[in-house]
């Protein structure tokens, strides 16, 4: 009896020591040590409320924001109130907004159970619907889509809260005579992906989204052209460098996933060569370059099995090969160094210096998703160029490493998610956050006055734009927290959107491991007794 009690005491001490060491290794966040992915998920969804345009709802949680853009579209005789500001300015750019909704919807569709278990189901649905409601509004006719509200040049000349803005709210559209296959295709993808998310909770709304998605895809495919050729004002901000081929394939594959209709898959197969789907082997995934994402969607079709004609199977296999090229590039396992993504000494994937964090967060999402697809299909490895192999566990580990880098596991010890951890950017390049809230001081702030009084001040922003992921450090892991350093301190909606899925997944994994450890501990104690 004494021996048994001694053993029990030893086990108890061991458990306490293990718990203490885990907490010390992390930041004592309440998740049992390490990073608090649940808090990061919560903050990420909160960020979208800071970016809202239009009439804010009664349950708005970001209280320093107010109604804005209430006359958007009025000059053109259309209702374009609502949607999201993409970053730290007050323009509504349709292409990155639609991409944000696609990624947020993909995250929700892929990690629905994990998001719900973290208590964020309602918030993710609200974040998606705020964007898709606007995208539906912007699609005013079968072959007409409003792609921008506001003018980047005049907007950037001023530093004003959204609630005060006096800059141009001119709206710009694409139509038959002024095509925009890229923005039409991305908007179709966003609405198709969102229709999957709302299928159970709001079936009528889901069908509405799908109807608009199908019309937009048909419009974009029938009247081809780059939207920045039709809307010159967007070129300096969101030029479509990759063209529209990736968006058309992306939209077709999302419509296939949403409807199950063979015709959309036939399109993705038939147009694979012409639109670059099986020709482009890329090392980045972003609001502009969608090839890696669509290649992964096509690979998923193949991995799910089914009776595919030989020609279909061969093309889908080409898609999978290109998808795995991207994933191997993130791991640095392709044979040619130029075929891999550069990595900083601190471990961050590095593509380019302007808002590099968008490439990091998108990579983390695609790595996470594909590791799950491998597991679900019974596979375990992918083949990289040159013959090297990589496992699903390696993909997942790289995804987690990038997520942890974002949250503070980096040489600077800085969380690049605003409001998370002890050290995070305090001078985010964000008009609304950098100026006193209109609720605290309702006095009008003029265009140039905002620069003089708020932009150039050295202190921290008066409002914390929690959940925003800023552009992040350079290729040497260096970061300068200054409002004028927009390449590093400006946050964008498409930086945070993919991390909603990643953080939900990592939190679920952490909780599952914690439960397993607790069960093992209880089992050990029972054996001792």
Swiss-Prot record:
Keyword Secreted: yes
Catalytic residues, chain numbering: 89, 429, 481, 490
Signal peptide from the UniProt entry: 1-24
Glycosylation, residue list: 342
Compartments where located: Secreted
EC number, as in UniProt: 3.2.1.4
Group of enzyme by EC: hydrolase
UniProt KW keywords: Carbohydrate metabolism, Cell wall biogenesis/degradation, Cellulose degradation, Glycoprotein, Glycosidase, Hydrolase, Polysaccharide degradation, Secreted, Signal
One of the protein's GO biological processes: cellulose catabolic process
Catalytic activity entry: Endohydrolysis of (1->4)-beta-D-glucosidic linkages in cellulose, lichenin and cereal beta-D-glucans
Tissue specificity remark: Expressed in roots and flowers.
One annotated GO molecular function: cellulase activity
Membrane-traversing stretches: none
Chief location of this protein within or outside the cell: secreted
Pfam families in the cross-refs: Glyco_hydro_9
Gene3D superfamilies to which the protein is assigned, alphabetical: 1.50.10.10
CC annotations in GO: extracellular region
InterPro entries documented for this protein: 6-hairpin_glycosidase_sf (IPR008928), 6hp_glycosidase-like_sf (IPR012341), Glyco_hydro_9 (IPR001701), Glyco_hydro_9_His_AS (IPR018221)
Family: Belongs to the glycosyl hydrolase 9 (cellulase E) family.
Protein's name according to its UniProt entry: Endoglucanase 21
